[in-house]
């Protein structure tokens, strides 16, 4: 039996606004581990980074990488895997996730959700993008949202889609 090994996750707090959320790093780490445990992704010897930034930081990333000059709640950047064989001891890079504080806070407040629940959802959502899930087509969206619900239920977070549209 193979033992589950979560990915090594580095959480980088790059905007002072996150200092108001003392548990943000622990929330993100718990959400990533839960998501990794419930997917078929091989996360042993894998690494990813989560950047907790502000709306301006996410807006810059969104403009540079997606051509959309506005902030959003979460962005995921799956790592390109190198061609050829990597050294046996090289970690597998899953990619990077960026989460915008002001948008996350505003959405949680507008939807009457606890901030930690919404942050958990965005971390799970971002991780699923790194391991190949998407929501461009209806069938993909249904599969991704169903898995998000299952993962979040394991974390004690209610269905995030019960009263809203999909995460961008």
UniProtKB/Swiss-Prot annotation:
Enzyme Commission identifier(s): 3.1.-.-
Cofactor remark from the record: Binds 1 zinc ion.
Cofactor(s) the protein needs: Zn(2+)
Annotated localization: Cytoplasm
Flavoprotein listed as a keyword: no
Residues where Zn(2+) binds: 125, 129, 135
One Gene Ontology cellular component: cytoplasm
GO molecular function: metalloendopeptidase activity; RNA endonuclease activity; zinc ion binding
InterPro entries: MetalPrtase_cat_dom_sf_prd, YbeY, YbeY_CS
Keywords from the named record: Cytoplasm, Endonuclease, Hydrolase, Metal-binding, Nuclease, Ribosome biogenesis, rRNA processing, Zinc
PROSITE patterns the UniProt entry points to: UPF0054 (PS01306)
BP-aspect Gene Ontology terms: rRNA processing
Family membership: Belongs to the endoribonuclease YbeY family.
HAMAP family according to UniProt: Endoribonucl_YbeY
Function, in words: Single strand-specific metallo-endoribonuclease involved in late-stage 70S ribosome quality control and in maturation of the 3' terminus of the 16S rRNA.
Name assigned to this protein: Endoribonuclease YbeY
